[in-house]
A protein has these predicted regions:
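Alpha-helical cap/lid subdomain in secreted, periplasmic
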Residues: 73-215
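Short acidic active-site motifs
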Residues: 70
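Serine-esterase "nucleophile elbow" of acetyl-processing enzymes
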Residues: 2-64, 74-81
Length: 215
């Protein structure tokens, strides 16, 4: 009887796919692949409802140093031909780091967001924008104008939040919590700039909870 029940559960289990778009914060610079936030999110989701659905390994299009236009070019090169059940977008820190104007970022970010919506099968409620972390609180920023960095990150995140609302997608603020822990060793990768798996776990918990509500 137990074997029959397992077969029934398997027949109704839904397989979900997840596309993660971004930069170093998505690929997980200096952490193991399973410790980046997309992989941790999938692991959490598969633990929460193991008999109801299963997320396959996330497809990640992200690389350290990418700006919005570089991510867009990489998406073109990937020639994505399928749709995904969930799409996340976290991009912009390198635009800020290179001193690019916020107005230009808004144009390129909203274009990427529209592409993300298309990849979700035109389901904006299945698209999740994550806020840009503040690298100014990390040891890497020693000797730099931390307030200026914070102000610029806030301006970029304002664009992300308003654009997410305008296109009816989700916005997840991970920056506030990251600013609290961003100078603590256990929340940092060895380079003193990028997050550790422990920091990514916090993001994954928030994202997984939001995804469950959206499904």
């Amino acid at each position: 009887m137990q074997e029959v029940d397992q077969k029934v559960r398997s027949s109704i289990m839904i397989n979900y796919s997840y596309l993660a778009l971004g930069d170093s914060y998505t690929i997980g610079e200096q952490v193991l692949p399973e410790d980046n936030f997309p992989y941790q999110t999938v692991a959490l989701l598969n633990k929460k409802e193991p008999d109801s659905y299963h997320f396959t390994a996330p497809q990640i299009i992200a690389q350290t140093g990418w700006t919005t236009d570089e991510l867009d070019a990489a998406i073109n090169a990937a020639a994505i031909s399928k749709q995904y059940d969930i799409v996340s977008l976290l991009i912009g820190v390198n635009n800020q780091y290179r001193g690019r104007p916020v107005n230009n970022f808004k144009i390129e970010f909203e274009y990427l967001l529209q592409r993300a919506i298309q990849f979700s099968g035109n389901k904006p409620t299945h698209v999740f924008v994550l806020s840009i972390p503040d690298w100014g609180v990390t040891p890497f920023a020693e000797g730099r104008d931390r307030k200026q960095v914070a102000d610029e990150i806030d301006a970029y995140n304002s664009v992300c939040q308003k654009s997410a609302a305008a296109f009816k997608t989700h916005f997840i603020n991970i920056t506030t919590s990251q600013r609290e822990d961003g100078n603590k060793q256990e929340f940092l990768a060895p380079d003193g700039l990028h997050p550790s798996g422990k920091e990514y776990e916090k993001w994954a918990i928030e994202l997984a909870d939001a995804i469950i509500k959206a499904l």
